[in-house]
């Protein structure tokens, strides 16, 4: 596996990895004003993994939201509809529109508003590549011998109102008898024979039936051979399904999943279900997926050191997405943004304030990487775009972080818990959440939500101040705090004219550190603070409670945009973004490393080697840039036939003792056998 391929899975910072994942989250229904609402699915599907084949029948009960003459559903382009019938078993025509992966079914007699009917679809196809995926180049539905997965996002059954239309379902999956199927809802298993139409052998099969009787977003299925681990600790019915290669870490992931699930219960109350299946996915799909009672993690994401952040995000979706869901695309942050910040809160619980600070930095970078459209207007963006996903996830998470600062800890926690309880099993809007927050705050919060949802941009704070000596005894002895010894008068400035937020000021003195909450309004906000010790340094927002456009955030945002472009194959544009980062910090090891990656992909090995050396000699942030630069230099020397120099680089990589992303295993591998450049595809 080349370093670029790793970049997609493991070498990105968490925010970048998350962004790569988010780029490929599929679209909602093309028409925001959905003309129909699916109420229930009855699906029978037969999987033939060796042939990558599926045959299915889906009964779809739906209700017209307005007078309806044509029923439109999304369906994977590799699936061919062979027959559509109505409730009287009368055949109907069906038009396939490949441009938007839809099936259009004219209704001969129409359907009046609020009336319901059921259509039965018979369809089949092979799912073995990502060529016709709803997201080109990424598998969201795949059938194969080792592991088969059919995600709701993959449109393997007729879908309407993706992510907003809550539904119930009964899904029966017929597979070879040696396979296990994981899904959502109450499960029953029976020994059956595959339907004759689909049978190509006499091998025994089993049918797994999942009944999801609480409306949500079931429909994601994983089938394969797994080792199962169980836990009923804290009343949680947890099942972990990992491949044999990860059996050694399964107990640690089991323990962490229990801890995260119970932590979220203390914050938000009980979820829709206290059952959870954690299942390993192949490495050719999303880093993780979620569905009712299910979290899937791709194999490369299951690391020896428990990947508790990614796991926490998936588990948090059992509240935000499964239980409470967005009413529209403009409300999408109520799912992904809430899950993102729930993850950050667990990080704080597990790793302390330093862990939260790192998570907030990641969210800040994502929030400002594509801050060109207000979050409240996210529906105007293409949902396949990084802009949309950056807004709903990272800016959404940062809005909660800032609201926590405005409300205070107790009122914020009460707001989150009440929102989770009041809208459990329902779709919610941003206004629904704002009303609960205002009730607990005791005052209107229009200014806050308008500023962060209806506007773009973020402040960059600057402070200037003057210190005056007072006549208090503390001026002579900072430890004598009978009276203040110094007065600091100053001004906080920033560029946003309509900006309003409380901001924390920290004054480091010869004595104790002083903190003061200052209301910043407009471009210039004066303050006066009296201290006992002589002020030595004043910091604005030292704990990163407010989304700010600092130079570090600008640098990391440029790198994040570059990585997204690199994953899309636009290396020239990626290089431009990485160079923007260098303009902000010529010594940035991460920027040099990313530039080296681009040159490596272009097979410009001399320029790549130069950039890797610059990364090694840079600021060393993050630390892993050194070990991976050494490994990459070794690969370059192997490619150019300089084995002795290559071995020396691998040896220096081992000497760092930094095993980030499995670096030491990689170095040992190429110490034993020279790296060979992959052949270019025709």
What kind of region is each of these model predictions?
Residues 294-358, 416-417:
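Zinc-dependent metallopeptidase catalytic helix centered on the HExxH motif
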Residues 56, 160-312, 341-344, 536:
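Hydrophobic helix-coil surface modules that form long, contiguous segments used
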Residues 213, 287, 332, 336-407, ...:
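Acidic/His/Gly-enriched intrinsically disordered linker/tail segments
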Residues 23-55, 63, 82, 139-143, ...:
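N-terminal, polar/Ser/Thr-rich
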Residues 81-85, 182, 445-446, 459-540:
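Beta-strand-rich binding/interaction modules
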Residues 66, 272, 382, 389-484, ...:
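Amphipathic alpha-helical substructures
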Residues 113, 123-169, 547-567, 576:
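Glycine/proline-rich low-complexity spacer/linker segments in large multi-domain proteins
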Residues 78-139, 195-203, 207, 522-534:
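A surface-exposed beta-strand-loop module
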């Amino acid at each position: 596996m080349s370093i670029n391929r790793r970049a997609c899975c493991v070498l990105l910072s968490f925010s970048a990895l998350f962004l790569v994942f988010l780029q490929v989250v599929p679209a909602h229904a093309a028409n925001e004003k959905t003309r129909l609402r699916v109420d229930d699915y009855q699906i029978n599907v037969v999987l033939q993994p060796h042939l990558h084949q599926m045959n299915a029948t889906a009964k779809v009960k739906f209700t017209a939201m307005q007078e309806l003459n044509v029923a439109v559903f999304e369906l994977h382009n590799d699936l061919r509809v062979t027959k559509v019938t109505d409730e009287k078993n009368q055949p109907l025509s069906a038009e396939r529109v490949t441009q938007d992966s839809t099936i259009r079914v004219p209704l001969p007699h129409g359907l009046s508003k609020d009336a319901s009917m059921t259509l039965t679809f018979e369809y089949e196809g092979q799912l073995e590549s990502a060529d016709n995926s709803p997201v080109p180049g990424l598998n969201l539905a795949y059938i194969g011998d080792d592991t088969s997965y059919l995600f709701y996002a993959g449109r393997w059954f007729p879908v309407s109102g993706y992510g907003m239309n809550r539904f119930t379902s009964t899904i029966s999956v017929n597979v070879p008898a040696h396979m296990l199927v994981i899904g959502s809802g109450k499960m029953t298993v029976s020994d059956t024979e595959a339907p004759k139409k689909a049978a190509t052998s006499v091998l025994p099969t089993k049918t797994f039936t999942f009944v999801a009787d609480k409306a949500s977003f079931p429909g994601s299925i994983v089938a394969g051979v797994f080792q199962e681990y169980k836990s009923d600790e804290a009343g949680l019915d947890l099942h972990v399904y990992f491949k044999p290669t990860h059996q050694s870490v399964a107990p640690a992931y089991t323990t962490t999943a229990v801890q995260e699930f119970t932590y979220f219960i203390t914050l938000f109350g009980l979820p829709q279900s206290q059952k959870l299946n954690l299942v390993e996915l192949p490495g050719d799909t999303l880093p993780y997926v979620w569905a009712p009672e299910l979290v899937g993690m791709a194999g490369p994401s299951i690391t020896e050191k428990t990947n508790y952040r990614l796991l926490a995000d998936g588990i948090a979706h059992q509240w935000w997405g499964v239980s409470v869901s967005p009413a529209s695309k403009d409300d999408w942050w109520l799912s992904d943004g809430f899950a993102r910040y729930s993850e950050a809160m667990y990080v704080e619980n597990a790793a302390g304030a330093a862990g939260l600070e790192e998570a907030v930095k990641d969210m800040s970078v994502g929030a400002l990487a594509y801050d060109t459209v207000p979050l409240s207007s996210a529906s105007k963006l293409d949902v396949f775009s990084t802009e949309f996903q950056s807004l709903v996830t990272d800016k959404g998470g940062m809005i909660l972080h800032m609201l926590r600062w405005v409300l205070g800890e107790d009122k914020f926690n009460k707001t989150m818990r009440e929102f989770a309880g009041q809208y459990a099993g329902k779709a919610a809007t941003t206004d629904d959440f704002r009303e609960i927050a205002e009730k607990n705050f005791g005052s209107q919060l229009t200014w806050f939500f308008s500023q962060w949802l209806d506007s773009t941009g973020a402040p960059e704070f600057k402070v200037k101040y003057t210190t005056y000596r007072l006549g208090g005894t503390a001026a002579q002895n900072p430890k004598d705090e009978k009276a203040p010894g110094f007065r600091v008068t100053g001004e906080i400035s920033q560029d946003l004219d309509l900006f309003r937020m409380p901001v924390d000021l920290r004054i480091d003195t010869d004595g104790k550190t002083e903190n003061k909450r200052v209301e910043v309004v407009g471009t210039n906000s004066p303050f006066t603070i009296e201290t006992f010790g002589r002020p030595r340094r004043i910091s604005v927002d030292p704990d990163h409670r407010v989304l700010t456009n600092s130079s570090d955030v600008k640098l990391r945002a440029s790198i994040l945009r570059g990585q997204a472009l690199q994953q899309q194959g636009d290396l020239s544009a990626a290089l431009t973004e990485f160079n923007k980062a260098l303009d902000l910090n010529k010594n940035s090891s991460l920027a040099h490393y990313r530039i080296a990656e681009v040159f490596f992909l272009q097979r410009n090995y001399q320029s790549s080697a130069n950039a890797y050396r610059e990364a090694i000699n840079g600021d060393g942030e993050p630390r892993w840039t050194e070990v991976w630069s050494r490994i990459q230099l070794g690969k370059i020397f192997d490619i150019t036939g300089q084995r002795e120099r290559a071995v020396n680089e691998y040896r220096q990589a081992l000497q760092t003792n930094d095993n980030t992303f499995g670096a030491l295993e990689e170095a040992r591998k190429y110490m034993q056998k020279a790296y060979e450049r992959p052949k270019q595809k025709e």
